[in-house]
Design a protein with these regions (language model features):
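Aromatic- and acidic-residue-enriched carbohydrate-binding clefts of CAZyme catalytic domains
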Residues: 311-334, 365-400, 433-458
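Acidic, contiguous internal or C-terminal segments within carbohydrate-active enzymes
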Residues: 85-146
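Acidic-aromatic substrate-binding/catalytic surfaces of carbohydrate-active enzymes
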Residues: 9-98, 157, 250-253
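Active-site-adjacent "subsite" loops/lids of carbohydrate-active enzymes
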Residues: 334-337, 341-342, 349-420, 498-512, ...
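Active-site-proximal substrate-binding groove within the catalytic cores of carbohydrate-active enzymes
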Residues: 218, 231, 235-237, 453-602
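Short, well-ordered beta-strand segments enriched in hydrophobic/aromatic residues
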Residues: 14, 18, 117-125, 602
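Conserved structural scaffold segments of CAZyme catalytic domains across common CAZy folds
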Residues: 76, 83-86, 99, 118, ...
Length: 602
């Protein structure tokens, strides 16, 4: 395969024999043809007049949202070398009455031996201007017959596509563990992904029309992406598209999985990460709520039934009610240290909950420590404020770049380990909640979005791991955003959506050999005997996740003996398969045929 650019009187084509893009010559940009995988036509002609939308911010407060029609289309330039060929499409934008224009350049590249097309964007700006938001690329492709959309929410979600439907991935978060979308039917899969090795916050979206589906990435930019000296804006990643006739799993394995090994979060094996052996050997977790005689009795009964080696994820141990007064957890409830000791004497492990993201503005510490100085700020200076049904109090989102917040979380990690003698600490929401643009001027990062969110959390957890985590202790977090995999010993995977979709094994297809996960989804909160508990743990087992994460007061009820026995049998089976579950590869989902009994699970 050899990449090349071909020009005719009517059009320009960039391709390599496997993929090609044809754009007609003329006064306006559009796509005549985009063929992927040796000839699979992907576009309806003349449906791609708007490949980008950019919002500018000028020095006087100008704030235009500009489309290609607001500029002058200048055609294209050609760039070729020994390994790739690119066509750079150019629009001149008039942003002032200076003689010069300010071009936007969209580069589409074909490389040797690749079945993908690569899309990049740059723009020139007047001095002091920035681009504050970007939609790029915007690519409308043919809607396939009986098409389905797969997003990377949690384990992965598959949706029946509906006209007018919008399918979104907010990355990195529980709704977007990876930065890709897959549209497929029985004939193959369209692949759309950003190759961002810095895990910048972004939204990938597919909007379904009657004949076409528009894929777009939308981002609140970082002002640091505009060079103050040159006035040049660079979108700091490449977007790729492809088509795989072997389906969505083949696309993920052939293109996305290799990309992850080029990222700092994807190139580390489990063996290289110094994970305590007791966690590698773990098969079962329970989730205790509270510090009472009833809870402790249920924990002991669980250990009696399942044996030693259970992990106990402890909640409601702190001084105030759950989801209130964060981060003022201490003093712990008086009986909690004894509870930890009892669990450990029975050769099990206990790891308590804290939140790594929220600061209650009514908490004593928010006033005493000037928590407002650490809060994440919107562009208008106000706070991101959230209310959870568990508490119905205000919680503000804290910027992870704040040095004050680092000091608080590190202090909590120290105190929990040194005073309560736990087996580590669980820090909620870090690998689950999406980044927020921050415009605070005192946090040491450029205003807006960008990579500061991920890199700030990485610096925080690296500091805990390198200087504060006691020997053989663990730190883990909620959900499975890919960039956080090597920061945490384990990820608690419970937030995959269920409504109007099917859960599919996209995440284990890509990452099963480089991550330890616990659970499959939230277990029942009132009754484990209705069928869903067994289904959840079956899926947990099949996806390679550590089992359970169940309330022991429910599991140890007399009426739940069938469920407890099922879970113990599954645990004993899993215990014999650690060579598969630790660094093993998830191959594919297999549904056995035959006359198998079926039950309806509510």
């Amino acid at each position: 395969i050899r990449d090349r650019v071909e020009e005719t009187a009517d059009a320009v084509k960039v391709g390599n024999g496997s993929v090609e893009l044809i754009v007609p010559k003329g006064k306006a940009f559009n796509i005549q043809s985009m063929k992927l995988n040796d000839g699979e036509e992907m576009v309806v002609p003349s449906t791609n007049a708007i490949p980008w939308v950019l919002t500018y911010k000028g020095i006087q407060g100008e704030n235009p949202m500009l489309f290609p029609e607001h500029g002058v289309y200048k055609g294209y330039d050609v760039i070729q070398n020994d390994t790739s060929a690119s066509v750079v499409f150019v629009w001149d934008m008039r942003l002032s009455y200076e003689k010069r224009m300010y071009p936007i350049r969209m580069k589409v590249t074909a490389t040797d031996h690749s079945e993908l097309l690569y899309w990049d964007l740059t723009a020139d700006l007047p001095k002091g201007w920035v681009i504050s938001k970007a939609q790029f690329p915007r690519i409308a492709v043919v809607r396939p017959k009986d098409g389905k959309m797969i997003t990377s929410a949690g384990w992965g979600n598959e949706f029946d596509m509906a006209t007018g439907g919008a399918y979104k991935v907010t990355y990195p978060s529980c709704t977007g563990s990876m930065q890709l979308l897959l549209m497929h039917n029985g004939e193959g899969s369209f692949y759309y992904a950003t190759e961002d090795r810095n895990a910048c916050g972004k939204e990938l979206r597919a909007v379904c029309g009657s004949k076409s589906v528009t894929f777009v990435t939308e981002v609140v930019t970082s002002e640091g992406w505009t060079d103050a000296t040159t006035g040049r804006f660079d979108l700091p990643w490449t977007t790729v598209v492809g088509y795989n006739p072997d389906g969505w799993q083949a696309a993920a394995l052939q293109w996305y999985r290799p990309f992850t090994f080029t990222c700092e979060w994807g190139n580390k094996s489990l063996q290289s990460r110094n994970i305590p052996q007791w966690l590698l050997d773990k098969d079962l977790w329970i989730r205790s709520k509270g510090v009472t005689d009833t809870v402790m009795a249920a924990i002991n009964k669980t250990i009696d039934f399942f044996g030693e080696g259970i992990g106990v994820h402890t909640y409601y141990w702190h001084n105030y009610p759950y989801d209130t007064h964060y981060p003022d957890y201490f003093p712990a409830k008086p009986e909690f240290e004894g509870m930890i000791s009892t669990i450990q004497k029975r050769k099990c492990h206990a790891v308590p909950y804290i939140n790594g993201r929220l600061w209650d503005p009514a908490a004593d510490s928010y006033t005493a420590l000037n928590g407002a100085s650490a809060s994440c700020r919107k562009a208008d200076g106000t706070l991101y404020t959230e209310i959870y049904p568990t508490s119905k109090v205000l919680n503000t989102v804290t910027c992870p770049a704040s040095s004050l917040w680092h000091k608080i979380i590190i202090g909590l990690a120290d105190k929990i380990q040194n005073e309560l003698h736990t087996n580590g600490v669980y820090i909620d929401q870090i690998a689950a909640a999406a980044p927020q643009p921050c415009f605070a001027k005192n946090h040491g990062h450029a205003a807006g979005g960008g990579d500061f969110w991920y890199k700030s959390y990485k610096a925080l957890i690296d500091s805990i791991r390198g200087n504060h985590l006691r020997k053989d202790n663990i730190v883990f977090s909620e959900e499975n955003s890919e960039c956080y995999i090597p920061l945490f010993d384990m990820l608690l995977t419970v937030n995959t959506p269920h409504a109007n979709c099917r859960i599919v094994p996209l995440f284990p297809t890509v990452y099963s050999d480089r991550v330890i996960t616990c659970a499959y989804t939230y277990t029942p909160t009132a009754d484990v005997t209705k069928g869903e508990f067994r289904y959840q743990n079956m899926q947990c087992f099949l996806y390679g996740s550590q089992l359970g994460w169940v309330d022991p007061t429910l599991l140890m009820r007399d009426e739940a003996k069938t469920e407890a026995t099922f879970l113990r049998t599954l645990m004993e089976l899993r215990k014999k398969q650690h060579d598969i579950f630790i660094e093993g590869r998830y191959i594919r989902e297999f549904v056995p045929g035959g006359d198998n009994p079926q039950i309806d699970v509510p």
